[in-house]
């Protein structure tokens, strides 16, 4: 098996091969609504010389019908096995999963002469890598695309993070018991919600912007001091530790900090948890489990009705009480 981050000229290289078939299977991960190609992007693939195969109902969760794909020139395939057998290149959102209807793992469908393009999270999924290696083939890990200008068009991770940050605020607003913006009524005043965002990457910046647009008071923290101006430009307060250490790592991502720094930031989070209404965590470190930043004790110290949204849940979670894919209601005073 060959596994690598896609380079800038990847599409141009494969597009020169005539009649290659690109397959888009239906995602089988529980609750996943996304699809790897829309009818519009399928048209673009066809213009590059690809034939596009789409599993029936693959786009249903994203409101794309089979007829919409057919109108775009795609061929609808009735089942996953037939699609994998026919495709030269398979496009997925999620990494290969155990298929509930086939009672087998999707990785077993990969052929030695086939290419899989999807999120893989190689460092977090060593068993999956071993399984894919046993199948042969080429795997392009979209989550491993470097954050450089040359690869910007391939940066699906940042695209999803931007949407995730926005959605985190919408979810928080849905579960929060009050308005985000302050209100003055005949019955009295209602203060604006206080939001703390931990991790000011693409998702964090999107969350800050969305929360500010709804009228909340927003604070943000990141180990990388270079993001301070970005936070302030969005009208939020940057929570800063007076510590001679910077968290900027390779490729613009955060790095692992010293024990002393971690202790200082945990003390800051414990203090802020008692004051804010909503905490949104987005902190990730490439190739490692998500750092634990919000402890159970901090959650218990928050005000009744407070909300924590953990965007790092699937990578281990930034919050100790996180249960991926679920809403946990607990710790009432």
Model-derived segments and their meaning:
Residues 55-75:
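N-terminal beta-loop-helix "entrance" segment that forms/cooperates
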């Amino acid at each position: 098996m060959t596994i690598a981050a896609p380079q800038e000229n990847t599409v141009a290289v494969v597009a020169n091969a005539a009649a290659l078939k690109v397959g888009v299977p239906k995602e089988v991960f529980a609750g996943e609504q996304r699809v790897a190609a829309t009818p519009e992007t399928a048209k673009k693939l066809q213009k590059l010389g690809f034939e596009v195969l789409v599993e029936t109902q693959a786009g249903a969760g994203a409101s794309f019908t089979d007829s919409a794909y057919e109108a775009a020139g795609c061929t609808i395939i009735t089942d996953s096995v037939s699609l994998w057998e026919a495709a030269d290149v398979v496009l997925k959102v999620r990494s290969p999963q155990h298929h509930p209807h086939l009672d087998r793992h999707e990785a077993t469908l990969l052929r030695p002469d086939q290419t899989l393009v999807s999120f893989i999270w190689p460092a977090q999924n060593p068993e999956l890598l071993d399984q894919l290696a046993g199948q042969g083939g080429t795997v392009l890990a979209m989550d491993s695309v470097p954050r450089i200008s040359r690869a910007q068009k391939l940066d699906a991770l940042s695209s999803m993070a931007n949407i995730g940050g926005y959605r985190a605020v919408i979810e928080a607003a849905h579960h929060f018991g009050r308005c985000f913006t302050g209100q003055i009524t005949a019955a009295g005043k209602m203060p604006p919600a206080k939001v703390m965002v931990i991790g000011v990457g693409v998702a964090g910046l999107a969350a800050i912007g969305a929360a500010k647009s709804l009228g909340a008071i927003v604070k943000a923290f990141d180990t990388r001091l270079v993001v301070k101006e970005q936070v302030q430009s969005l009208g939020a307060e940057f929570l800063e530790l007076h510590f001679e250490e910077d968290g900027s790592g390779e490729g613009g991502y955060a790095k692992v900090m010293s024990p002393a720094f971690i202790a200082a930031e945990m003390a800051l989070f414990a203090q802020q948890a008692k004051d804010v209404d909503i905490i949104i965590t987005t902190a990730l470190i490439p190739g490692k489990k998500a750092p634990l930043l919000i402890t159970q004790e901090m959650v218990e110290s928050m005000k009744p009705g407070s909300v924590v949204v953990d965007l790092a849940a699937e990578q281990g979670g930034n919050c100790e009480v996180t249960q991926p894919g679920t809403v946990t209601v607990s710790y009432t005073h």
